[in-house]
Amino acid sequence: MKFYLVGGAVRDMLLGITPKDKDWVVVGATEDEMLANGFIKIAANFPVFIHPQTKQEYALARSEKKTRNGYHGFEVNFSKYITL
């Protein structure tokens, strides 16, 4: 299980600004492993978790494939074998 800082926190740090919040992507983990490590799932249909102490957001790495027209026409894969 590896954790990578992503999103606005990375941008802010590159600009020399202290990030207000930090979001993380998790590689090499399953939903069950996250729960077993004390993370709290916050999304019903998406593996996004909150760290119990820091309250920072952690999302499992994913791949997406366009399958249909429109905003919802995607197939999403959350395998622990997805890399960045």
UniProtKB/Swiss-Prot annotation:
Q: Which gene encodes it?
A: cca
What highest taxon heads this organism's lineage?
Bacteria
User: Any idea what job this protein has?
Assistant: Catalyzes the addition and repair of the essential 3'-terminal CCA sequence in tRNAs without using a nucleic acid template. Adds these three nucleotides in the order of C, C, and A to the tRNA nucleotide-73, using CTP and ATP as substrates and producing inorganic pyrophosphate. tRNA 3'-terminal CCA addition is required both for tRNA processing and repair. Also involved in tRNA surveillance by mediating tandem CCA addition to generate a CCACCA at the 3' terminus of unstable tRNAs. While stable tRNAs receive only 3'-terminal CCA, unstable tRNAs are marked with CCACCA and rapidly degraded.
Keyword RNA-binding attributed: yes
One example of a Gene Ontology biological process annotation: tRNA processing
Q: Which residues bind ATP?
A: G8, R11
Q: Which reaction does it catalyse?
A: a tRNA precursor + 2 CTP + ATP = a tRNA with a 3' CCA end + 3 diphosphate; a tRNA with a 3' CCA end + 2 CTP + ATP = a tRNA with a 3' CCACCA end + 3 diphosphate
Q: Which residues form a coiled coil?
A: none
Asked if the record carries the keyword Transferase, the reply is yes
What protein does this entry describe? Answer: CCA tRNA nucleotidyltransferase
Positions bound to CTP: G8, R11
Source organism of the structure: Francisella novicida
